Amino acid sequence: MTSSQVGGWQGFSRRNVVNFLILVLLLWCVFAGYRLTRAVSAASDARGALDSVDLDYRAWMAGDDQFDADIASVRSSLEKVHSSLSGPLMAPVRIVPFVGRQVRSADALSESGSQMIGVVDDLLVVIDEAGPGLQAADKRVATLRLLAAQMAEAHATLGSLDLGPEENLLSQLREVRTDLSDAIEEGLHTMEVGSEVAGEVAALLDGPSRYVLGAANNAEMRAGSGLVLSAGEIVAGSGGVLVTEMTPSWTRNLGSPVAIPDADLRSRWGWLTDGQNWLLNWMSPRFPATAEHAVAMWNAQSDQLAEGIVVVDPFALRTILRLTGPVETSIGTVDAQNVIELFLNGQYQGSLPGTGDQVLRRDSLADVAPNVVQKLFTADIDVARLFDQLRDVVDGRHLLIWSADTDRQRVWERVGVSGALDDRTIAVSLINRGPNKLDYFTNLRTEIAVVREGDRFATVTLTTTITNRTPVGQPQYVEGPVQGSITPAGAYRGIVTFNVPGAAINVSIDDVDDLSVAGPDGPTRVVGTEVLIERGSSAVVIVRFDLPNRVTELTLEPSARFPIETWVIGGESRRDGLSETVLVSEL
């Protein structure tokens, strides 16, 4: 072969090699583009699946079948993203500035999303296996501490997840990242609080500990809860739990008064709450203040001091009964279907033994509440469902807990079971002063309106309509008049109070000069006036106040009433009995 032929062949070979490399590069670009497009498409699918489930930990913990199927779809989409971007052929893409950022983001999101789902799934296995351990007194404390440790571990794992780059992402990846970030934040809160609660409950049950147990009846309302008509104790130690017999709370009235510990409660309600009569407590929706006073009254005549108090009402009992099944009591079978009607009205219709015995009627809830609470610790309960269903009970103020132990009280506050108010609260309470059982027939509707007044203040107007729908023919014990009462039969007499943010000024009630209560109430301010509403009639009470523009959010606090109070915001009615935060700018 001549030198010219050799040179030609070498040139041809070099051209072929170059062309081949260019072809390979083009094919690789097509392949990488396809894999990247597939990954972005899968990310879009994951985003859609995330939208459908909203990564609600509550449904996750409850084991909802449809939710499980949706989560499986999210997991599948995230795994498809990961597989599309894996392998040695995709490695070079990671160094390309913009494209590489998308690849690194999609890979990190798929990996973190799958890990997050795995963490919660693993925890659910532990929770499912915890049921038998919670039934046995000798295993209860250890089981709760194991749950606390597992939730703490899940919290640590979630906190370590890396979602990859945050800036300059494709819209699909940016949206998936936002959703996953929000879900992880919620998960971190859930695991942190869950771990704290499991640990504190374990410590309580390890004991020795003693709490007052109060049974509140929503047929006769106080501020933020029903009136505590019966009381007993929950005594715990070494994992065992004993719920003592409950007696009418008025039997615990004192011969001499106990000082009201909370200064605002004393200043606002000292004229009515005398420190002796249990039925005259509970005038403020700030449960920590009224609870501390109740425990002080209880301990004034007890040899063994209670650390705190737990208050449950028929709605809390209904939730427990859904999980434990019915209980047999001296008044018959009580289950989740009949407990509300029974205690709010049915028990007063002559359905109880001893129809003429008012003491028996008054104490009927006391016969049931200990049985239901005791069964909570012995029945075979789905722990995940318990976690799920107690959420609304807590949010609706149907389960309230206070402890004199400041560390333990801090946990109750974090869980939302403390009944505390904050400086953004709006709470409307209707306190029964009949005394009768007409709250079951009384509706509360509050419309909120906001008008901006310059750059510094907004004027807020609360228009509350109270309607007495008591039917004719109710027993005297329900509609009155009670002996010694000035309230006519079928009429509702009470005090309607409004707790508003502490920063509010110029708080007033239209056409009312002589207020029943006015002034600071913890982080809020309160005003109130008496109302007398005849059967079939309504009363309208209008409150106005100026709110500094620095207050940007309001928390609508539920009252635990039934019928549930209605809030009207922007013409839209909201009636779920749950706490809600609203933006002042949207009112």
Please describe what each predicted stretch is.
Residues 2, 7-9, 13-19, 28-570, ...:
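Non-catalytic, solvent-exposed segments at the cell envelope interface
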